[in-house]
Amino acid sequence: MVRKFDFLVIGSGIAGMSFALKVAHKGKVALICKSGLEEANTYFAQGGVASVTNLLVDNFDKHIEDTMIAGDWISDRGAVEKVVREAPAQIEELIKWGVDFDKNEKGEFDLHREGGHSEFRILHHKDNTGAEIQDSLIKAVQRHPNIEVIENQFAVEILTQHHLGVTVTRQTPDIKCYGAYILDPKTGKVDTYLAKVTLMATGGVGAVYKTTTNPLVATGDGIAICLLYTSPSP
């Protein structure tokens, strides 16, 4: 079966669901989850989310410096700056979608200070921030009329020009993505999902190791799928 959407989102953690919510006003979204929506690394994150919220005592430069030091200066500075400077706006988005960060008696964020941070800038929900974020985003995507959630199915291959009969290898220039093949493991059936935009938000690889605190779904299959069409670094 061939299904057509404006956006195909593969992965249902904070990255996948927040992207789906941001673009849903522009068209139909398919959100693919290889297990249940609750099972993602996001759900198991406890401490909180770091963001500059009080410019009287904190600033972006401090946060950027703290992050670079904690990463032993091997972090991509451009990426660090982007994440730090855009964090407050993303926090507002999470709140808009229903995330309830703890506040003090003054109605201000109850900020914590964690390892590597020079200031109090950790927003949290008790000690289960990830679960609060995941649960809130699940409710938001489930009530959005333009988002269709497909659980217990997963991507096995992305669609490139080979879908049009063109031979595609790692060396093919200007490889384009047209969607993905999605497998239903219960039936063994593979459906073709076509989309104008495809986002891979499949998380990490923790579960490929013998010892990990990651959930079993963190197998890195999304990374492996994309590597099929990525030229190795010189």
Regions found by a protein language model. Name each.
Residues 28, 33-178, 183-189, 207:
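Conserved N-terminal/central alpha/beta ligand/cofactor-binding core
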Residues 21-26, 201, 227-228:
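Alpha-helix C-terminal capping segments
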Residues 229-234:
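Conserved small/polar residues in nucleotide/adenosyl-binding loops
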Residues 7-30:
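N-terminal Rossmann-like FAD-binding beta1-loop-alpha1 element of flavoenzymes
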Residues 198, 218-225:
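Extended, hydrophobic alpha-helical segments in both membrane/secreted and soluble proteins
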Residues 205-211:
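Flavin (primarily FAD) binding-site architecture
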Residues 10, 194-202:
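Short hydrophobic core segments
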Residues 3-5, 189-196:
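Core beta-strand elements of the Rossmann-like FAD/NAD(P) dinucleotide-binding domain
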